[in-house]
Amino acid sequence: MERRFASQTVVITGGCRGIGEGIAERFGREGANLVLVSNAERVHETAARLVADTGAEVLPLVVDITDEAAVADLYAQAEARFGRIDVSVQNAGIITIDAFDRMPREDFDRVLQVNTTGVWLCCREAAKRMVAAGHGGRLINTSSGQGRQGFIYTPHYAASKMGVIGITQSLAHELARHGITVNAFCPGIIESEMWDYNDRVWGEILSTPEKRYGQGELMTEWVGNIPMKRAGTPADVAGLVAFLASADAAYITGQAINVDGGLIMS
């Protein structure tokens, strides 16, 4: 695989599983230094696996991305270790599923704190350092198909991901003069732990006495609505993210690009 990102440093939040791990593996195979961020200790296991599989240098960090001081410290550590920050992928995210009239306020607030405020804090800190260094950079944010249109039992998640697109477009205007592009991607159904949870909980809520969903059945039904007739993989998403981080995407900014097999066409 071409080493397009040799000597570049890529920060990836939510990097120890699912889409984030797939993105990290892609950048590692293309020569980047990796800063792998998660709120879970398992990030160290993922980092060790990436070193073995890709040969990349990896700095694993356990960070709460809703903590402003902790976010500043993570970028300081990244810069101290590798000397610069070229790409920052704001991928950390959470979801809960419940009817809006039963949803605890704590769930609503926490989803927005992680999915939207966390993205803003990381973009802000990464951009400060990119501007100061004067070499431009790439900010890439994880939105969702629900950033395009809301869905049942997840109003807080939809709001959080629509907010990510708003942040992306606003910062794209503000940072263009510094040579920093800001884009988002909107995954659909992607094989991951999050979608295992989605399949189980949505399946429980949407089941009726006439039709009960077993494990995997709801996801299979929904995949049938995708023109390409399959769920996506983290590697499918990683290919787009690597493109947006590359020199080939230097004139692309402020965009939110669907990665969903054609489920949402816009």
Segments predicted by a language model, with ranges:
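Conserved glycine-rich Rossmann-like NAD(P)H-binding loop of the short-chain dehydrogenase/reductase
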Residues: 30-46
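Substrate-binding pocket helix/loop in short-chain dehydrogenase/reductase
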Residues: 99-100, 104-112, 222
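Conserved glycine-rich cofactor-binding loop
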Residues: 9, 16-17
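Alpha-helical segment proximal to the catalytic Tyr-Lys
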Residues: 128, 173-174, 250
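Residue(s) in the substrate-gating loop at a strand-loop-helix junction
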Residues: 144
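Active-site helix of classical SDR
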Residues: 123, 160, 168
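Short, small/polar-rich loop/turn modules that mediate ligand/substrate recognition or access, typified
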Residues: 176, 181, 252-254
